[in-house]
């Protein structure tokens, strides 16, 4: 298991503020957190000892004594993210800044859960060795899957294209195979979390709603600093607006549309090399899909009143950008009298949203206050009963 200890609630508050502000002085941390200066000083000292953060002089300001800014030590801890398309599995290692430091694309030819897990495990081990990263510096592994959860946490109803994940077998296999915490999340929620943590340059982007265009039309939301999954992890599914027996604004629908026009692409990865002759088909699809997604924007605004709605997923970045342009090309009726729809933007993570989002899940569980379910934690006062090992 990693050397990272369980952080107190107050330590998580500070780390989360540093995550979101990317360079902040101690006095600002005290103001934003509501803690006393003495408490901030004590907690910052322990986080510095752990090697999780650094403090450096800011020499970009006026003359005189420079401010000292706290930032994450990006390469202190790492996480792995695993995400899937029909034919391939993408496995990445990300650092605390959300940067992908290594990636492997692995072909998937099997419906066997154990073979999928073994391939992911081999890819993670290979990347850690290539980067000389110790396993105890790996916070955990996040697995982003296209599917819905049943009433039991290990029961996953995967998209029909992903039989290896049916009935929770792969979930249990992932959790049993790795000697670090393994977290499984649906792809929409993982993408929303990655966008919130790593791409939100505005700390006021909460609530955030993510429309995830993958094989289906999924979604995710971050509300009050934590992913909102509902009772069983299946909240935020805008695809319910689009019947399966009719044209839908989904990635699979785009592949089917291209196939009907004579362009036989197996998966999203092949869209970057589409022939020029397919351009008119894609433009027609974007025009129709963008118009359909206006309804999702309106409904998401009505249900969640988000500060921002993000559109992203598995499509190439330029297609997502054109989808957003199409959505915004006509006025969208607000959800009620006098209420406008929420601002809409394209994902800043682009096609990396799935992999970075998956890797973000372990970081969120380890460092963010939203992952602490018990507000009555014994760690609330910022102290813990057991000593820990400082960074070497």
Curated annotation (Swiss-Prot):
Keywords: Plasmid. It comes from the Bacteria. InterPro entries: ATPase_NBD, ROK, Tscrpt_reg_HTH_Crp-type_CS, WH-like_DNA-bd_sf, WH_DNA-bd_sf. The keyword Ribosomal protein does not apply. GO terms for molecular function: DNA-binding transcription factor activity. Belongs to the ROK (NagC/XylR) family. This is Uncharacterized protein y4fQ.
């Amino acid at each position: 298991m990693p050397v990272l200890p369980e952080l107190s609630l107050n330590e998580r508050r500070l780390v989360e503020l540093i995550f979101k502000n990317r360079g902040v002085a101690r006095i600002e941390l005290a103001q934003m957190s509501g803690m006393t200066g003495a408490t901030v000083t004590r907690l910052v000292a322990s986080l510095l000892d752990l090697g999780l953060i650094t403090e450096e002089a800011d020499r970009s300001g006026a003359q005189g004594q420079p401010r000292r800014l706290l930032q994450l030590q990006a390469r202190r801890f790492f996480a792995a993210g695993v995400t899937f398309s029909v034919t391939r599995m993408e496995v990445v290692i990300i650092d605390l800044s959300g940067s992908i430091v290594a990636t492997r694309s692995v072909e998937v030819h099997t419906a066997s859960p154990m073979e999928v897990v073994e391939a992911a495990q081999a890819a993670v081990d290979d990347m850690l060795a290539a980067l000389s990263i110790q396993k105890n510096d790996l916070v955990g592994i996040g697995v982003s899957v296209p599917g819905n959860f049943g009433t039991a946490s290990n029961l996953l109803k995967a998209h029909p294209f992903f039989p290896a994940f049916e009935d929770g077998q792969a979930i249990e296999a992932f959790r049993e195979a790795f000697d670090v915490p393994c977290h499984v999340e649906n792809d929409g929620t993982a993408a929303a979390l990655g966008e919130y943590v790593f791409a939100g340059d505005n700390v006021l982007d909460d609530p955030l709603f993510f429309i995830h265009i993958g094989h289906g039309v999924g979604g995710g939301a971050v509300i009050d600093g934590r992913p909102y999954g509902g009772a069983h992890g299946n909240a935020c599914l805008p695809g319910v607006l689009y019947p399966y027996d009719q044209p839908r604004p989904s990635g699979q629908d785009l592949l089917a549309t291209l196939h009907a026009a004579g362009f036989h692409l197996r998966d999203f990865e092949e869209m970057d090399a589409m022939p020029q002759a397919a351009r008119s088909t894609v433009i027609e699809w974007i025009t129709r899909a963008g118009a359909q997604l206006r309804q999702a924007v309106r409904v998401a605004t009505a249900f969640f009143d988000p500060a921002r709605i993000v559109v992203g997923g598995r499509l190439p970045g330029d297609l997502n950008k054109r989808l957003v342009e199409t959505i915004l090309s006509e006025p969208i009726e607000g959800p009620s009298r006098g209420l406008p729809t929420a601002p809409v933007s394209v994902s800043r993570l682009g096609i990396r949203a799935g992999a970075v989002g998956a890797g973000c899940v372990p970081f969120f569980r380890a460092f963010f206050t939203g992952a602490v379910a018990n507000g009555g934690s014994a760690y609330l006062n910022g102290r813990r009963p057991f000593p820990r090992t400082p960074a070497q």
